[in-house]
């Protein structure tokens, strides 16, 4: 099945078919706490546009990508965070499990390097 035609859990959240712990929403994106948190603070910012991953982004998505990062930063600042890790997995081998572009924001503990 084509990944673009699959209805992901994130699309169901966007469509309000399933609930989420929403932190922010506008006409371009939605942000919510990750239900499988990997840090004390772990939220996701996802575009409402159905983009599978960074691999499928086109030049016209540049402003949207910047907006996603800006929104995540705004949320982090509203939580008084001064340190966080930003992660985008692209493809199954990188750890992407939901094939709808999403940015992880993680904080609240010391992050190790390398992450993989």
Regions found by a protein language model. Name each.
Residues 1-116:
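HIT superfamily nucleotide-processing domains
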């Amino acid at each position: 099945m084509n990944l673009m035609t699959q209805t992901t859990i994130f699309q169901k959240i966007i469509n309000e078919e399933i609930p989420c712990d929403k932190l922010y929403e506008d006409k371009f994106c939605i942000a919510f706490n990750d239900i499988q948190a990997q840090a004390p603070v772990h939220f996701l910012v996802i575009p409402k546009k159905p983009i599978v991953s960074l691999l499928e982004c086109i030049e016209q998505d540049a402003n949207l990508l910047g907006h996603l990062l800006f929104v995540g930063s705004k949320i982090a600042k509203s939580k008084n965070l001064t340190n966080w890790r930003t992660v985008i997995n692209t493809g199954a081998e990188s750890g992407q499990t939901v094939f709808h572009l999403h940015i992880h924001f993680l904080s609240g503990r010391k992050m190790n390097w390398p992450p993989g």
